[in-house]
Amino acid sequence: MLTPRNLMTFFLMTFGMSIHAELDFQSGCKDLIKSNQCIAAIEGCTVFANQGNPEAQTLLGFLYSGTRYGDFRKNYKQSFNWISMAAEQDYTKAQLAMAEMYKGGEVVPENARKAKVWYEKAAEKGNLDAINGLARLYRYGVGVRKDHEQAFALYQQAALKNHLASQVGMGLSYRDAKGVKKNLVKAYAWLSLVSDNMEDRAFKNIQKRYEQERENQDKTIPQCKFILKYDEFDDLFALGYAKRELLSLKQRMGLKQTKKGKDLAVQLRQEIGQ
């Protein structure tokens, strides 16, 4: 007979097992990647991947295709197989990775239509990177008929939720009159919104640090720790791109237009809650 005490005991045991399993996954997979123990990470992540852990499967896929240097040989087939297993479990990050693989054409042959399918699966669950991916397909007509209005709508959907790359997309759309009437003030505002996330000096310091890390990498051993920083790299790329395009845009605008753009950026920041 189930009593309140029995239920509490069952709950604590189940919760404790869950926490223990998560800690094991952290130390037995993710921490090994973080400390750049690439071969050990593959072995450790494989244990959890074989247990059906979709995050482990995705990380294992990244390890097989993203590890570089040393005597490591990439295995694109294994990478695709593990990531597709996670994607079929409805793991959003894996679905996004499937889209990027089909779009990039390195791990598997390029197939923009399949990329669109996987972007849509992840976008349906609100993944902002996937929404941005769809926007790029429509903007450039990759795998779909070029549709600037649809691209703009998708950029806007993610931009209003503070997705940096989509905010850059908004700025470029207004600048180039793609899917919306040309408006340099609004273009300036959106690009400024992204650029202002980090001061120029701080951004340059981060750039310098990453460049030094890359130059000082020991290429005699496998390198894999950076695969945990993919999202961070994407945001830094968006920041750098926004700063560069904003500087170029300033040269086309007068002082009054620039001031209007700055004021609008403040308004947008308040509306978005940035």
Give the positions of each predicted feature.
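Hydrophobic face of amphipathic alpha-helices that form TPR/SEL1-like repeat modules
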Residues: 28-31, 59-68, 97-104, 133-140, ...
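Structural signature of tandem alpha-helical TPR/SEL1-like repeats
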Residues: 34-43, 71-82, 109-118, 145-154, ...
